UniProtKB/Swiss-Prot annotation:
Gene3D superfamilies from the UniProt entry: 3.40.1350.10
Domain of life: Bacteria
Protein name: UPF0102 protein Sare_1228
Disulfide bridge positions per record: none
Organism: Salinispora arenicola (strain CNS-205)
Family (UniProt): Belongs to the UPF0102 family.
PANTHER family assigned to the protein according to its UniProt record, in alphabetical order: UPF0102 PROTEIN YRAN (PTHR34039:SF1)
């Protein structure tokens, strides 16, 4: 991944994090990593633990941002969530998997779509 794409992705994650906070969610972890992958954001939405995948795009050339979360990616996030829960000892009655699509434009603020329970 190019440095420019990394910068766009990092910017999108910061925007998504602020969006979640503004919506009243409580982030507990950001960019959690293990040998099997990474979870972008983990946050409480009331009693529900949300595992959030952030996808940022500058154009729709390669499709909508959320379309990048394919079956294999969803399965990997489920495994990562189980590992995070086990490692931290966190208990949650409900775990939800969300996708935040961030579209960055040259003019104006980014557009953020929060798909709760995306998979």
């Amino acid at each position: 991944m190019s440095r420019r794409n990394q910068a766009v992705g990092a910017y999108g994650e910061r925007c998504a994090l602020q969006h979640l906070i503004t919506a009243g969610m409580r982030p507990v972890e950001r960019n959690w990593r293990c040998p099997h992958g990474e979870i972008d954001i983990i946050a409480w939405d009331g009693p529900v633990l949300a595992i959030c995948e952030v996808k940022t795009r500058r154009t729709d050339t390669f499709g909508a941002p959320a379309a990048a979360v394919t079956g294999p990616k969803a399965r990997r996030l489920r495994v990562l969530a189980a590992q995070w829960l086990a490692e931290t000892g966190t208990r949650a009655d409900e775990v939800r998997f969300d996708v935040l699509s961030v579209r960055v434009t040259a003019a104006g603020p980014p557009r953020i779509e929060h798909l709760k329970g995306a998979f």
